[in-house]
Structures are given as structure tokens and as C-alpha cells.
A protein has these predicted regions:
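Hydrophobic/aromatic residues positioned on beta-strands within the core alpha/beta folds
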Residues: 79-81
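Active-site residues of response regulator receiver
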Residues: 52
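Two-component/phosphorelay signaling modules centered on CheY-like receiver
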Residues: 11-29
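Alpha4 helix (beta4-alpha4-beta5 surface) of REC/receiver domains from two-component response regulators
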Residues: 62, 83-103, 110, 114
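Short amphipathic alpha-helix used as the core "switch/output" element in two-component signaling
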Residues: 61-73
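Receiver (REC) domain active-site loop signature in two-component systems and cognate sites
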Residues: 55
Length: 121
């Protein structure tokens, strides 16, 4: 069973994603911001980090950089609504930092789960 760290500050979206991932037999650990995610990140267990990019305390860009220092091979999916700048700028930065996939909000849950499956099985 794959272990996923899900980082999203929107409680409703995080709950929906967690439920969908668990229905697909993934183990999900939740965090509401990058700082909390770093505390919960388990390098030996984590197969995938799914992170929003715009969050309080520590954003997803900083989180990706920190996690890639700890475990460069960890897979990452970045999601963003982009705030005032729109999602494309933030998502392209995430790709440059090593995100394996990016999704602009709102996105298709079916496409999202398919991408998770293709990345970690």
C-alpha cells in the first residue's frame, strides 16, 4: 500500500481528496501547511507528496524544495488555484523544482486519481 502525504489548507478539498485516495487503497497522512507537512514527512515511508502551492506558514514551493533535499526521489504532485497571479506561474515553478505532475484548481477528480495511480501504482 502506497503512503501519501497530502498537504492542503482548504479543509473541504483536503477531506475530499483524502476520501478519494483512501477509497483507492492509499494510506493518507494529512497536513494543512508546509511546516506541518515537514513534521509529518517520513522519508522511508512516503511514496508521494501532494501539495497545494499557496498556503499559510510555509507554502508548497518551499515544501517541495525542502522535501527534495531530504529525499530527492520522492514523487510530487502540485495543485494550485494560483491566487491573484493565476495557477500557471506557480505550477511551472513546481515543475522546475521536480514536481512529477501539476493540477490547476478546479480539476477533475478522476484525472487526478488516474495520475496518482500512474505515478505510484
Amino acid at each position: 500500500m502506497a503512503y501519501i502525504l497530502l498537504v492542503e489548507d482548504d479543509n473541504d478539498l483536503r477531506a475530499m481528496l483524502k476520501s478519494s485516495l483512501e477509497k483507492n487503497r492509499y494510506t493518507v497522512i494529512e497536513a494543512s501547511n508546509g511546516r506541518e507537512a515537514l513534521q509529518k514527512f517520513k522519508p522511508l515511508l512516503t511514496d508521494l507528496v501532494i501539495t497545494d502551492l499557496l498556503m499559510p506558514e510555509q507554502d508548497g514551493i518551499g515544501l517541495i524544495m525542502e522535501i527534495k533535499k531530504i529525499k530527492p526521489e520522492v514523487k510530487v504532485i502540485a495543485i494550485s488555484g494560483g491566487g491573484k497571479a493565476g495557477p500557471s506561474n506557480y505550477l511551472s515553478i513546481a515543475e522546475t523544482l521536480g514536481a512529477d505532475a501539476v493540477f490547476a484548481k478546479p480539476f477533475s477528480l478522476t484525472s487526478f486519481i488516474e495520475k496518482v495511480s500512474s505515478i505510484i501504482g
